[in-house]
Amino acid sequence: MQKFPYYAITVRRYNVLFRHTDWLKKTQELYNEILLFYYRLYLETFPDQQPGTQEALRILETLTIVGRDKQPVPAPLPWKKIPLYFRRAAINTATAAAKSYLARGTQEHPTEKFTESVTFYKGMYRDFQDNTISLKLWNGESWQWSRLRLRGNTVPEAGQMMSPALVLTKDRAELHIPWKLPVSDGRSARERITAEENICSVVFTGQDTCAVCCILNADGRRENSFFIKGGSRYAGACRQITEKLDKSREVQGGGENPRANAHYWERLRNIHDHYAHQFSRQIIDYCKTQNARILVLPEFDKDYSQIILAAAGRNSPIRLIPSIREKLKYKAWQEGIVVVEIQQHQISSVCSQCGAKIRRKGGDFLCQNGHRGNRYLNMAHNLGQKCLDGFAATAD
């Protein structure tokens, strides 16, 4: 297997077309029964000291699987002829769940039932092509190699396929396939600053122009700017759905219960995800166009962000900001762009050209020395300059 010095992992989702949908459900049910068995065994075996994942796998298999010596084991696996890699996938998932339970003090009782998606290790899948794959499935009586048709996504031109997961939802089956993709540039932010690469600083407005990008060169001079619009479209699309949701509540009731109007809540989530993906992709594409290898974002305090989101309207573009930031981080790394977060202190109160105090009026600013312009672009410039100054100070 080829090794990449720098890589990113992305997940491609495919819709599964398969005649025997009951086989998919039976395979998942068996997987979760085995998972629960090993979850309980792990908690009994390692109540205090927790070994590493590989060591836990070895010990749990020793306790449950008869070896070559044919000697009885303390806790034999209740199921017969379970494929090796199917069992190991369940053990690793059980180990992760048990460690999570032991690490938390808030969960009083261990989990009684699992509904995890099945992870197929090598040996449980084969013959993957653009639109088909073979999975080893349990039909209730025996294991069968089954050919599944896939729809809805493409195969990356480069990279390595990792273990797929079968995800069953209420009305469909999906196959989620992680791909390890090579990253062309894995240098640190300091190495890029030393090489005098351009930087792109971004501030979020929560308005129709939801993000403002500013390109600075190594000397701090502004080279370009980009205003990303679409916040009003997002708010309008959400408003249409929330109005229908409110009417449905009046007629059918249900309060805040998401299941009462599940299709409306799903549409809201889809709209949110669509615009977050769209805006983050525009920022990354702009960085690539301007050859900016560092993306500077304002640092967000989690508690403060929750206060702002609580105060914002339910259709406000402000609600997109956390999702855009999250997507920017992994999309930037995939493109060989490194993300740096800088504190926002004073970026909105001084002029980016002379450092004098400014007065704000709507979306514009005016400084004591007569400089004026868009205040969000001024903030983005100050944020980028603060990044450059910070690296320069630590280099001295």
Residue ranges, per PLM feature:
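Residue-level signal for secondary-structure boundary elements
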Residues: 32-50, 99-106, 253-256, 291-295, ...
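Generic detection of short hydrophobic beta-strand segments and adjacent strand-loop junctions
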Residues: 2-18, 142-152, 226-230
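Gly/serine-rich nucleotide phosphate-binding loop at the start of the catalytic core
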Residues: 1-92
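Acidic carboxylate diad motif detector
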Residues: 54-172, 182-183
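Positively charged, helix-rich recognition surfaces that bind polyanionic ligands
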Residues: 175-396
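Stable alpha-helical structural segments in soluble proteins, enriched in small hydrophobic residues
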Residues: 34, 89-101, 377-387
